[in-house]
């Protein structure tokens, strides 16, 4: 049966992979989305609701959902969990005061049944800001070492400078191709 599905997928093309970009407000989610889509920084405003764009990366098509991260919007994230292949969780590495809140939101999200099979890429963003948490500090602060039975990787990034996004997307694309 799997061979037949692979044959038809080859004939008609693979489906778009669904990726959610999540994280607290101000973490850089929208900047990352448009950096991936158009290759440059665009002026953004706080996302009230969501942005959804198609992103092509190394011959793969992704439907990328950037969900607002404000306190009032986070409870609605779960409305978008169905059929999610991967999560890009963005952390503002320069916002030491809210890393605990980010940890709580991540832990709550990862308990959802609909996300059990989703690959997780954590982006320790804003690495270009002096005094920010290092990649290792973000990893520990989020409690990622305690996660079991989940495909996960953390990357240090600067969305505004475009640094670290290619390694993250390479890893994500590779993981998603292996899951197909």
From Swiss-Prot:
A lipid is attached at residue 2 (N-myristoyl glycine). GTP binds at residues 23-30, 66-70, 125-128. The keyword Protein transport applies. GO terms for cellular component: cytoplasm; Golgi apparatus. GTP-binding protein that may be involved in protein trafficking; may modulate vesicle budding and uncoating within the Golgi apparatus. Plays a role in male tail tip morphogenesis. It comes from Caenorhabditis elegans. Expressed in neuronal cells. Expression in hypodermal tissues is absent. Belongs to the small GTPase superfamily. Arf family. It comes from the Eukaryota. This is ADP-ribosylation factor-like protein 1. It is found in: Golgi apparatus; Cytoplasm; Cytoplasmic granule. Disruption phenotype: RNAi-mediated knockdown results in male tail tip defects. One of its GO terms (biological process) is vesicle-mediated transport. Keywords: Cytoplasm, ER-Golgi transport, Golgi apparatus, GTP-binding, Lipoprotein, Myristate, Nucleotide-binding, Protein transport, Transport.
């Amino acid at each position: 049966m799997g061979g037949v599905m692979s044959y038809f997928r080859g004939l008609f093309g693979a489906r778009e992979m669904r990726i959610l970009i999540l994280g607290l407000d101000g973490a850089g989610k929208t900047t990352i989305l448009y950096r991936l889509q158009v290759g440059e920084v665009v002026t953004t405003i706080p996302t009230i609701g969501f942005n959804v764009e198609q992103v092509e990366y190394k011959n793969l098509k992704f439907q990328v959902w950037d969900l607002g991260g404000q306190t009032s919007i986070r409870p609605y994230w779960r409305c978008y969990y169905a059929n999610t292949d991967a999560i890009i969780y963005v952390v503002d590495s320069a916002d030491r005061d809210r890393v605990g809140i980010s940890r709580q939101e991540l832990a709550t999200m990862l308990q959802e049944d609909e996300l059990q099979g989703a690959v997780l890429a954590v982006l320790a963003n804003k690495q270009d800001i002096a005094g920010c948490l290092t990649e290792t500090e973000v990893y520990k602060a989020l409690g990622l070492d305690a996660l079991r039975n989940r495909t996960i990787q953390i990357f240090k990034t600067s969305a505004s400078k475009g640094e670290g996004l290619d390694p993250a997307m390479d890893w994500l694309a590779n993981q998603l191709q292996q899951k197909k």
